[in-house]
Amino acid sequence: MTEAFARAKINLTLHVTGQRPDGYHLLDSLVVFADVGDRVRTEPAEALSLAITGPQAVNLPVSDDNLVLRAARAMGGQGARITLEKHLPVASGIGGGSADAAATLKALAELWQRPLPEAAAVLRLGADVPVCLEGRAVRMAGVGEILEPLAGPLPPAWLVLANPGVSVPTPPVFKALARRDNPPMPERLPDWGSADELAAFLAAMRNDLEAPAIALAPEVAETRAALAAEPGCLIARMSGSGATCFGLFAEERPARAAAEALRAAHPGWWIEPARMAG
């Protein structure tokens, strides 16, 4: 048996800088990961199969179009019994499906003793799959295929992730964008010596999908505001195309206290504190 952890992908920034003739949008994004996520387990079998367990399994029915099965077929489609233990909300802007696909590629590469697919095949699985396969903090550009390592390590920090229980499909959010030629981040990203310095940088940056997502799902604005109001929250913003938002904290204790308070105030929300991983 092999196992891989599918960590949540967090877009600390997400600038939409253009659109290609084929319709794909060009992005400039600072991507980090959180130490919370799904787990993929694989075992030898004659046929390819997928079982989904975990607290979020009810929201993700098994189908041939599931990214886990698509990733398995991209690896060559041998037999394997795959179990996806689902903890991340579905269609929530934190790369759950893409992280699951990347974890499947890693687990099956070990099980079958095969190399990972070429970069183009990985990108065809989804724009976030390459960065999830990378699994570390990067600057992501192009349509997701350009991954630039950061100049230095990220400062120690914690994230509180909050999802109000609504799914925000990505295509309508992009369709509702007012502009598709927004300015990118600075050419050279600074080195951040502390979580406060990182938060100050983020405050001058954007998630261009936040406004259209809020127009489609006003709960996103409520979630962001609830995070921002918690003591110790340095900045709150939506990740990806939503609806999950993150709050950035310098230390573990206020992050866990914020998560506990938010769970009490919003029992229907999905809320997780997690260390920010570089």
Swiss-Prot record:
GO function term, MF aspect, one: 4-(cytidine 5'-diphospho)-2-C-methyl-D-erythritol kinase activity
The protein's enzyme class: transferase
Summary of the function given for this chain in its UniProt record: Catalyzes the phosphorylation of the position 2 hydroxy group of 4-diphosphocytidyl-2C-methyl-D-erythritol.
Signal peptide range in chain numbering: none
GO term, biological process aspect, one: terpenoid biosynthetic process
Residues annotated as binding ATP: 89-99
UniProt protein name: 4-diphosphocytidyl-2-C-methyl-D-erythritol kinase
Naturally occurring in which organism (per UniProt): Cereibacter sphaeroides (strain ATCC 17025 / ATH 2.4.3) (Rhodobacter sphaeroides)
Gene that this sequence comes from: ispE
Catalytic activity: 4-CDP-2-C-methyl-D-erythritol + ATP = 4-CDP-2-C-methyl-D-erythritol 2-phosphate + ADP + H(+)
Keywords on record: ATP-binding, Isoprene biosynthesis, Kinase, Nucleotide-binding, Transferase
EC number: 2.7.1.148
Cross-referenced Pfam families: GHMP_kinases_C, GHMP_kinases_N
Catalytic residue list: 9, 128
Pathway of action: Isoprenoid biosynthesis; isopentenyl diphosphate biosynthesis via DXP pathway; isopentenyl diphosphate from 1-deoxy-D-xylulose 5-phosphate: step 3/6
Family: Belongs to the GHMP kinase family. IspE subfamily.
